[in-house]
Amino acid sequence: MATYFVGDLQGCYDELQLLLERVNFNPTQDKLYLVGDLVARGDKSLECLRFVKSLGDSAQTVLGNHDLHLIATALGIKKVKPRDRVDAIFNAPDFDELIHWLRHQPLLVHNKKLNFLMVHAGISPDWNLETAKSCAAEVEQILQNGDFHYLIENMYSEQPDRWSPDLQGLARHRYIINAFTRMRFCYLDHRLDFACKSPLKYAPTELTPWFNLGNPLYKQIPIVFGHWASLVDEPTPKGVYALDTGCVWNNRMTMLRWEDKQIFTQSAVKNYSDF
């Protein structure tokens, strides 16, 4: 049995299949973890959703910002962006079933046995493990069982940009969603920055990657995440695994085998910017 993690798919189905073939992935024995953003901008988002869903307990994803945006468009809250290339999902006979399944995916996975945390973007520099898990569960409960339409409709805001345990209601839930699905750089006072998406060497000096802000949690448990394609080939601290290597931006898809930490990569098989 082997455990694999793969970076953001974003509709890049063919590259995923090539990687799974290379490692001889066997869903009856192995497990595949995905760091979120299964959809958007690649040409096979529908295939990605169907495939991951079809794996059942042999796969586990977390919600990314593009996944949440797909739910928002499914609810009619946002319009479909042509560049996201998700029309096939909306025309699919299993559309409702796929959105229902996606809505029931977590924001955070903590595997005690294998000793890892998996998120899409990151974990707030102000959270310990207990807070991170409780915050994730709080929003997941609403997405899966509560008034998720109201939450999705009101999640599009960059405020508040700083965590406080006193946050309540939508403000609290927006921060939780943004930390788990959108965070990259932070200010030294731990405020989230949403503007800078550049490689580290081009970032303003007042900004620091979230994983360099000294949260003890970052050293206690290995963290696997995606979201930040411009981190490709950038060093990260020990135990912090950045797996989004920009396949949909004509770079490559990255897979990590957990047991021996071996990396497998697959270059983009097509120029997605040509579509």
Swiss-Prot record:
Q: Name one GO molecular function term.
A: bis(5'-nucleosyl)-tetraphosphatase (symmetrical) activity
Give UniProt keywords alphabetically. Hydrolase
Instruction: Report the EC number(s), separated by commas if there are several.
Output: 3.6.1.41
- Matches recorded under InterPro entries: ApaH, Calcineurin-like_PHP_ApaH, Metallo-depent_PP-like
Taking the record's annotation, the residue ranges forming a coiled coil are none
User: What broad class of enzyme is this?
Assistant: hydrolase
Pfam families recorded for this chain? Answer: Metallophos
Q: Does the keyword Hydrolase apply?
A: yes
Reactions catalysed, semicolon-separated, are: P(1),P(4)-bis(5'-adenosyl) tetraphosphate + H2O = 2 ADP + 2 H(+)
Q: What does this protein do?
A: Hydrolyzes diadenosine 5',5'''-P1,P4-tetraphosphate to yield ADP.
Family as reported in the entry's similarity comment = Belongs to the Ap4A hydrolase family.
Question: What protein name is recorded for this chain?
Answer: Bis(5'-nucleosyl)-tetraphosphatase, symmetrical
Organism in which the protein naturally occurs = Haemophilus influenzae (strain 86-028NP)
